[in-house]
Amino acid sequence: MTQLQSLGRNDQRTGSEGSAVIKGIDDELILAARLLLATLFLIFGWRKLRDYSGTVSQILQLGGPMPVLAAAVAIFMELPVAFAVAIGAFTRASALLLVLYTLGTALIGHRYWTVTGADQVDSMDGFYKDLSIMGGFLLLYITGAGKYSIDVLCGIAAP
């Protein structure tokens, strides 16, 4: 049976239909997904850390709760937790934390239902991008870190 014929059949490892178009690169694709998902958070987490007072001001302007604490939580989620995803350490727990964090940022930072015009379009764009990112983290929770990860290296997860 060719690889294309096997598409749609159950994948023995994940139980999902056709986990990859080309079998054998699942772990490489999971690594790429982890790195891509983490990139946004690492870039903006570093920015938030470098301008902590600006981060607090932005949260205050958005009407976020406890801006000083919220800024610290944002930096924690976007730097060490996203870094854990990137290297595949505590991947499932980190992915779930980032799902919850991203839901919070969507609901606090992108309330498109409270604005009109161009602001509404921008907020709606951010809101639905956040939902899409949440979907990526949920998939990462389901698949796990893959072979190229600290989780596998330390025996936390099977390859």
What are these regions (language model features)?
Residues 2-51, 68-159:
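Extended, low-polarity transmembrane helix blocks
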